[in-house]
Curated annotation (Swiss-Prot):
Listed GO biological process terms: lipid droplet organization; lipid storage; response to freezing; seed maturation; seed oilbody biogenesis
UniProt family annotation: Belongs to the oleosin family.
InterPro entries linked: Oleosin
GO cellular component term, pick one: membrane
Protein name: Oleosin H2
Region (Disordered): 124-144
Pfam families for this protein: Oleosin
Subcellular location: Lipid droplet; Membrane
Residues recorded with modification N-acetylalanine: 2
Role noted for this protein: May have a structural role to stabilize the lipid body during desiccation of the seed by preventing coalescence of the oil. Probably interacts with both lipid and phospholipid moieties of lipid bodies. May also provide recognition signals for specific lipase anchorage in lipolysis during seedling growth.
Motif stretch (Proline-knot): 61-72
Membrane spanning stretches: 28-48, 53-73, 75-95
Domain statement: The proline-knot motif may be involved in the targeting to oil bodies.
Length: 144
């Protein structure tokens, strides 16, 4: 009997699992303010769900009755919106292409004189070398 501890109460065992100190004041205030807010939002969500279900119940027969009109109208609107979006995309593509082309032409126009000078120097060097070679050949022909 001495080896069995009977002096512990069941509440002491439960309290040993609980933390020593309780929640802070800010935690209590957060729960007190957020709990009613959550309840109000849950009620609003339920009301919106109820309204949606009632609206579908009322509108479904109207959709069925007017579907020969609504389906082609919806398709027409969808195609028109798709056309406008595609037109806008093509317009943006055209503007960006023209912008790239203008920038390319400006860059080429700025570097064109440099390229012409480089080509002129190469032609002059080639002509000068050919002239020297022709002079050498003529001197070789003159001196037998």
């Amino acid at each position: 009997m001495a080896d069995e501890p009977h002096d512990q109460r069941p509440t002491d065992v439960i309290k040993s699992y609980l933390p020593e100190k309780g929640p802070s004041t800010s935690q209590v205030l957060a729960v007190v303010t957020l709990f009613p807010l959550g309840a109000v939002l849950l009620c609003l969500a339920g009301l919106i769900l109820t309204g949606t279900i009632i609206g579908l119940a009322v509108a479904t027969p109207l959709f069925v009755i007017f579907s020969p009109i609504l389906v082609p109208a919806a398709l027409t609107i969808a195609l028109a919106v798709t056309g406008f979006l595609t037109s806008g995309a093509f317009g943006i593509t055209a503007l960006s292409s023209i912008s790239w082309l203008l920038n390319y032409v400006r860059r080429m126009r700025g570097s064109l004189p440099e390229q012409l000078d480089h080509a002129r120097r190469r032609v002059q060097e080639t002509v000068g070398q050919k002239t020297r070679e022709a002079g050498q050949r003529s001197q070789d022909v003159i001196r037998p």
